[in-house]
Amino acid sequence: MGLHLGQAIFLLFAAGIAGTLNALAGGGSFISFPALLFVQVPGVTANSTNTVALWPGLVASTIAYLKRLKAPLRVLFPLLVASAAGGGAGARLLLKTPQHTFLRLVPWLLLGGTLLFAFGNSIRAIAGKTTVIDDLRHTSWQAIMASSIAQLLVAVYGGYFGAGIGFMTLGMLAMLGMRDIHAMGAIRTLLAAAINAAAVVTFIVAHAVLWPQCTVMIAGSLAGGWFGAHYAQKADPRKVRGVVIGVGLAMSAYFFAKVL
């Protein structure tokens, strides 16, 4: 399908905002995914195109956070493998979902992601009833295995839809005993990039991406992701979260009205 200038500008700004939000607090898909639906992209194709478009922004955020990434390889590697495996599985599941079925799932997915985002700190608090061990060098293999299984489940959801996975990952890291939010943010963005990398490859191989729309959004998400990662510490996270939750609820209500 074609792309008009007005649509291109709209998608560029939507992806820029989404990339910034993903770096600041997560939840960027609450902006960029509905934006694709608003320009008449079919549901499954909109989701796959959105995933590919936002991935470069995640990579940009990951690079910006590298100085905070201090987790040992024995912890990171199993989590990365689980992320990639789950992301690919979730993406393949999405491609097998009929368009009309997915469109009926959209408001539920948006609402579920919004609630997960809204109560993410509570999830972290519940998961974090453990000894504080921001130094992960002495993490037991049992803890690493349990966290990897949890991350695999997060990644399947992430490959399928993905809104709210950041807080699920933060909850998993809290289970390991981490408390340094910036160190946790660095791992969160890395694992999200791994989840979406597997999904991106799956979608591209399956020819499930609208490239005119995707290319415009990649430019926006790159700029937004880099900006958000560098200015994350200056933003008031409570205000950012409030905006994201408000948008998520509004989008959920809009799509519920469309399908009911």
Language-model-derived ranges and their functions:
Residues 90, 151-160, 199-207, 214, ...:
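Hydrophobic alpha-helical transmembrane segments in multi-pass integral membrane proteins
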